[in-house]
C-alpha cells in the first residue's frame, strides 16, 4: 500500500482503511465469502447430508491415467428438487440401489468441497439406502428390506 498513489502522513489511517476496503472487492475469494456464494450454489444448502430419490444409475469413466467405470447414481433431492450425481462406494454397491429408492447422500470429502480422486464432477456419495447403511449392505451384515 506504500505505492505512489497511497496517502502518506500522520492522519492517513482512515483513508488507507477505506482504500483497502474498496480494493478487497477485486479479489474473487473475498467476493465469494462476503456474498456467501458457496452456500447459495450448494445443492444441500449448507446441510451435512440430504435425502433424495434415485432417478437413474450411471457409470462414469475415471480420469486419466486410470481406466475404470465408476458406478454412480443420479439423485433428485427432496428438499429443493435439484439433481446431483452421487458415488456408490464399495464393491457391487450399485446392485443394492434401485431406481426410485430413497437414499441419503453426503459430501465425498474432496478438497474444498470439490470432486475427489479420479471421479470427474462427483461431489457426493451415498450413505444410506432406505434405512440401511450402504457399507453394511456391501459387507453382508444387513439385508435390504423388500417392499
UniProtKB/Swiss-Prot annotation:
Pfam families: Ribosom_S12_S23 (PF00164). GO terms for biological process: translation. InterPro entries: NA-bd_OB-fold (IPR012340), Ribosomal_uS12 (IPR006032), Ribosomal_uS12_arc (IPR022863), Ribosomal_uS12_euk/arc (IPR005680). It comes from Methanococcus maripaludis (strain DSM 14266 / JCM 13030 / NBRC 101832 / S2 / LL). Disulfide bonds: none annotated. NCBIfam families: PRK04211.1, uS12_E_A. With S4 and S5 plays an important role in translational accuracy. Located at the interface of the 30S and 50S subunits. Part of the 30S ribosomal subunit. GO terms for cellular component: small ribosomal subunit. SUPFAM superfamilies: Nucleic acid-binding proteins (SSF50249). It comes from the Archaea. This is Small ribosomal subunit protein uS12. Keywords: Ribonucleoprotein, Ribosomal protein, RNA-binding, rRNA-binding. HAMAP family: Ribosomal_uS12_A. Belongs to the universal ribosomal protein uS12 family.
Amino acid at each position: 500500500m506504500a505505492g505512489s498513489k497511497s496517502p502518506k502522513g500522520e492522519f492517513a489511517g482512515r483513508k488507507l482503511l477505506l482504500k483497502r476496503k474498496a480494493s478487497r472487492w477485486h479479489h474473487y475469494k473475498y467476493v465469494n465469502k462476503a456474498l456467501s456464494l458457496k452456500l447459495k450454489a450448494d445443492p444441500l444448502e449448507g446441510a451435512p447430508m440430504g435425502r433424495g430419490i434415485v432417478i437413474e444409475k450411471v457409470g462414469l469413466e475415471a480420469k486419466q491415467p486410470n481406466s475404470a467405470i465408476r458406478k454412480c447414481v443420479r439423485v433428485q433431492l427432496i428438499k429443493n428438487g435439484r439433481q446431483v450425481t452421487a458415488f456408490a462406494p464399495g464393491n457391487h454397491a450399485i446392485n443394492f440401489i434401485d431406481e426410485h429408492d430413497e437414499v441419503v447422500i453426503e459430501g465425498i470429502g474432496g478438497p474444498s468441497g470439490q470432486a475427489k480422486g479420479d471421479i470427474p464432477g462427483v461431489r457426493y456419495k451415498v450413505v444410506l439406502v432406505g434405512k440401511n447403511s450402504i457399507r453394511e449392505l456391501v459387507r453382508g451384515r444387513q439385508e435390504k428390506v423388500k417392499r
